[in-house]
Amino acid sequence: MFVVRTFGRSAAVDDDRREFSLLGKRQVGGLALARPVATGIRSRAVLELHQNHGSARFRALVGGEFAPGEGDRLAWRVRLWETARPTPQQGLLRGALLPGLPEGLDHAVATGLHADLNSGALPAGRLVIDRAGYDQESSPVLFATATELLLHILLAGAFGSLAEPAIRSWVAHGRSPLALPRVGVEAY
């Protein structure tokens, strides 16, 4: 597990946390134009962010998987799920979170993906967001940011780049990096 902390923000990344699985009773998804890629491996990660704002501490946990594929399309899916009585689970950072992605936060996750999905810059393959955790102070803005950062982490893992600079940048400055990790592009 990788953890970065400052006074106002914290981030933690781990390979997986099945206790935050989303069963997918509802889901959104689609196909996006993508760049063909030459090589890459399946990458799975879970990211938790904390951000202090005044007396509030906003939290977001998202996780998923990216698998590079052939062609010029990226199939993406966000599983949405909330139990009637979720059991709190220990997050990656201090404190418990409720597994699930309730209404409102689900839109934030999709929003966090849309800019990159619409750019045509993502590599071809399959992307699924299927892990999430929240609490009463979870923020849609932080969930969108967490989703953007998770995409950086998944692509870095799939193509052998470092995800750490993107995470450190967010913790230090509160902003996601503008450029996605470099991926091997297929020659035509």
Regions found by a protein language model. Name each.
Residues M1-Y188:
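Accessory interaction regions appended to the cores of large information-processing enzymes
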